[in-house]
Amino acid sequence: MSTTIFQDGQPTLPAAGVGGGRCPDALLARYGQVLDGGRLNWTQYHNLGRRLGSGGQGVVFLTTRKGTDGFTLPVALKVFSPERYDSESAYSAAMERIARVSAQVAQIQQDNLLDVQNFVEQRQIRIMEMEWIDGYDLSRLLAPDLLEQTRERVSASRWEYLNNVIVTPGPRQSRLKPGVAIAIVRECLAALAALHRVNILHGDVKSSNIMVKRTGNAKIIDIGSAVTLATAPSHRTCTPAYAAPEVLEGRDHSPSSDLASLGYVLVEMLSGQPPFAGLTSFQDLLEAKRSL
């Protein structure tokens, strides 16, 4: 990690008539101590708010991170559940893997990837601090009840515009217009490319793991299933309807596996129905994916 350091040739100065007095020596000395100390530490407080979601890995809360002088910042906290692990050591090993991958993802700084801010523990339960995204996950945007609620709230002319340009009812859920769907996929591809360049696989690309912000931009979230190519465990979790055939069969994963999952999301957005709806048997699901 490297950052260019430079000396500002035009420093910010007080406006005319503002300040100008001498800083107290004691305050200036404390400033110097902070700069020269080599280490900083402080206590952070989070007020848990509403649940944003839950799944096999745990629960995500919207929280408020409190600083000093009245500073507050909305962030998301994911509390990782130990339920699926048969021992504390198994839970700890899995959390260490997630922490390592999360640290790598945090350094990528790609606009379409979730920003991971910290990974901590409370009573040996691991917690990931992430940016809070002001928007909806794609599965919610495709839900038919949301489209109906929108229809009830907008004017007839606005509804006509939405149907012509953005979204229409589909067979089982809402269907996005091709231009909108492609824009979402394009931004997800940028996020996946950033992961793949550093040999990380997301491992669970699906509509509920894609957030669409109120600005219209898409972000891939939930890196709890992400692994590095070099250290991928032999047994991994997946969402069967969105998993590539090789993932379902327990064979080696690759960047192509993530791309296949994103392809199923594209089919879902354009068709107006969940991918491979109605298929319950493992073999039927595999055959349907191979023939798509």
Feature roles, as predicted:
Residues 119:
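Activation-segment/catalytic-loop signature of the eukaryotic protein kinase fold
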Residues 88-107:
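AlphaC helix of the eukaryotic protein kinase fold
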Residues 123-137, 141, 145:
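Conserved short submotifs of the Hanks-type protein kinase catalytic core
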Residues 233-247:
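Conserved activation segment of eukaryotic-like protein kinases, specifically the C-terminal portion
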Residues 49-56, 60:
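Protein kinase glycine-rich loop
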Residues 184-185:
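Activation segment signature within eukaryotic-like protein kinase domains
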Residues 196-212:
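Catalytic-loop of the protein kinase fold
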